[in-house]
């Protein structure tokens, strides 16, 4: 999760840093608070209940107020898990954890796109498009297209790149990174 988010944001010219929200100090850059709701583990096929694939459900949301997009992101792990389960349920636990962690990182990057661009608009392709399939999230490469990168900040990655600090109160028992 952390590595995927860092890789996606680096392409947009940002550096990410993860902090405990109870212990953070002032930051030079943007502070974003994330909340991971639900069970962020993908079950093995033998442990499956009656999970129904989700369609039209938001797997990630960013708070808004008065037309502004606020630095508060929510990832619905239950919806994301249901989306990924058919694709990875027979894989070993480490592979399922990796797929979920990478997918959470991609959803977080998508939501950060909205905050950093201060736009609810979506390009037609890439990581900022409006809808993801489980297959999109499982792709080896699923990145921002050029229009999304331009909207966020067209600055090249340099040592003094703006920092995005992510504080999470969500807990992931599997230790995804």
Predicted feature descriptions by range:
Residues 1-108, 112:
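Metzincin-family zinc-dependent endopeptidase catalytic domain
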Residues 2, 67-103, 115-177:
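Metalloprotease/metallohydrolase-associated module, dominated by Zn2+-dependent proteases
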